[in-house]
Each structure stands twice: as C-alpha cells, then as structure tokens.
Amino acid sequence: MMSELRDQMIERHIRAGYIKSDSMAEAIRLIPREEFMHSIYVDHAYVDQPFPLPGDGKQTISAPYMYPIFYEPLTLVEGNRVLEVGAGSGYGAAIARELVGSSGLVVSIEINQTTFDFARENLGRTGYDDVVLVHGDGSLGYPAEALYDAICITAACPAIPLPLIEQLNAPGKIMAPVGGPHSVSG
C-alpha cells in the first residue's frame, strides 16, 4: 500500500517537474518516507504538505516535493561530500546518502535535541546509520568533515553564514531559502 502511494507520488513529482533525474526518482523510491514521520501522521506520508515532528512543534518534515527542489540543483553524484543544515526527521539526509552512495559522505546538523534524537532513531532504524548526525548550530557548519561538495540549508536564513561558505569545496554548490520563508536561492 505505502509503496504504491510512494510510486504515485514520484510519478506526480516527475510530471510536475520537481523530479528531473532518474537518480532522484530511484533515491526517493528506495526510502520509506513513512518511517521518518511522527506516528500520528504516518498515513499521510505521501501527501504533498509538511507535517510536525515530535518536540516543540516548530520543526517539520518538509512536503515531499521540497526534497527534489533542494537536492536536484546540487547534482549530487557518487562520492560527493554533503552537509545538510537542519536534519529534521532525517529523511533529507537519507535521500542525500542514496545520491552520493557508500563512497560519499553525508553530514547532517540539527540544533533541536528532540528532533536530533528523532532523526538519529529514524536513520538507524532504516539503515542510514552511516550518516554523520551532529547536534549543534548548523550556521557554524561542521569543520571536522569539511570540505563539502554541496551544502543544503533546509531552514530560511537572512544570508548564507560565512562558516558554511568557508567549508564549501571549490567548485561547490549551496542551496538555501535565503531572504524569507518563501524564498529559495541556489
């Protein structure tokens, strides 16, 4: 049942132009989004809207179409090193991990302790325990694993923090919603 809903969502996102690459379609096909949802929302895992995560109610799992919007422009390939700022449920990190493969690296930072614990549990349970999950301030990046080929900031920010720019490989790409809650810059 859920795999059918996942396939329908993928086809919907291909038709809408959100999913552009076969690698993105395959990554999303392999990851059971329902495993990254708060238990009371599992039945809605493939509905195109965000849902609250456990905790203070401020963190959400983004609407499913947002992941290809953020990750497709980064053109992640096998072996890339990726920093995700805002781990949320861990779903985005799992997608990035599928895209960069076992020779790549995904580091995901989460500032909220409850959300961090939820992401760690989800990633471990679904076999993505090789994602480096860090509890801390994402605006500082994670210098211990820098340089990164790509950085994805999942929360709105007034500007891209300088420490993240300094941790970006050259050439590299940053994707971030800069300027306000409805802005996206790449």
Predicted regions and their residues:
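Class I SAM-dependent transferase core
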Residues: M1-V85, Y91-I95, L99, T114-R125, ...
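Conserved nucleotide-cofactor-binding alpha/beta core module
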Residues: T75-G186
